[in-house]
């Protein structure tokens, strides 16, 4: 695997505390093996910080014991490694897509002036909502957008993805109304952005910057929806 040696001007125990934190809590930290050596060449152990030894990725027993005994096959370890990497990438992608979606909603309401519509200066023709209502709604919808991406990552046909988005969309609408005290601020965005985020989940990250490819996936998901629902 990849290796790196760093020379650090810091107290060894302090460096070990940082590396242990990364190993235990970073999304792919379980795959890191970061040793800290003192100037005399001796290794700093986790136990010196009052931390338990690392556990095996597969069975939860002592990682050191499993490694020495070669308890698990290379194939098992490779499969687990791929699973950890895939889950980390999927989680990072879902968070980023949700951030983009919420950012779009916030930017849209912030555009000023928008005659007849809610903006930073007034509520236009609306009497039941204002700029802050939209902010509350956008914040409430971020978990939903992330969920849509994760649903897209589950695979299946475009139609199956759309079907899987329906219940989360209904629950998101209820969450929106709780955040806005009953006001419909983003019902249309729940539908359209939900499909968009689901499409992003279905696509490899490298295709996100290709609007034609993204819209093609959205179209495949929404194909026949009008005739089926109406």
Regions found by a protein language model. Give the residues of each.
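Long, contiguous binding/interaction regions
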Residues: 1, 13-90
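Short beta-strand-to-loop capping motifs
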Residues: 5-13
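Long amphipathic N-terminal alpha/beta scaffold segment
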Residues: 10, 32, 166-169
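Catalytic cofactor-binding cores of redox enzymes
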Residues: 33-36, 44-51, 57, 177-204, ...
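Phosphate-rich cofactor/ligand-interacting catalytic cores and adjacent structured alpha/beta frameworks
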Residues: 83-156, 162, 200-230
């Amino acid at each position: 695997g990849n290796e790196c040696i760093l020379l650090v001007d810091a107290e060894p125990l302090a460096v070990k505390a940082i590396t242990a934190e990364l190993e235990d809590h970073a999304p792919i930290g379980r795959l890191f093996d970061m040793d800290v050596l003192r100037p005399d060449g001796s290794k700093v152990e986790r136990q010196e910080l009052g931390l338990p030894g690392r556990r095996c990725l597969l069975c939860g027993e002592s990682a050191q014991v499993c490694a020495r005994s070669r308890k698990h096959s290379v194939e098992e370890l490779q499969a687990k490694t791929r699973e950890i990497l895939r889950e980390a990438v999927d989680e990072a992608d879902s968070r980023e897509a949700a951030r983009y979606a919420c950012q779009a909603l916030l930017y849209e309401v912030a555009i000023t002036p928008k005659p007849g519509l809610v903006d930073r200066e007034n509520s236009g023709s609306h009497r039941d909502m204002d700029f802050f209502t939209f902010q509350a709604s956008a914040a409430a919808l971020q978990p939903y957008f992330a969920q849509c991406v994760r649903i897209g990552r589950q695979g299946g046909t475009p139609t199956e993805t759309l079907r899987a988005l329906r219940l989360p969309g209904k629950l998101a609408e209820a969450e929106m109304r709780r955040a806005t005290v009953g006001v419909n601020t983003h019902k249309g965005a729940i539908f359209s952005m939900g499909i968009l985020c689901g499409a992003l989940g279905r696509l490899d990250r490298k295709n996100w910057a290709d609007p034609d490819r993204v819209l093609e996936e959205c179209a495949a998901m929404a194909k026949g929806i009008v005739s089926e629902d109406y």
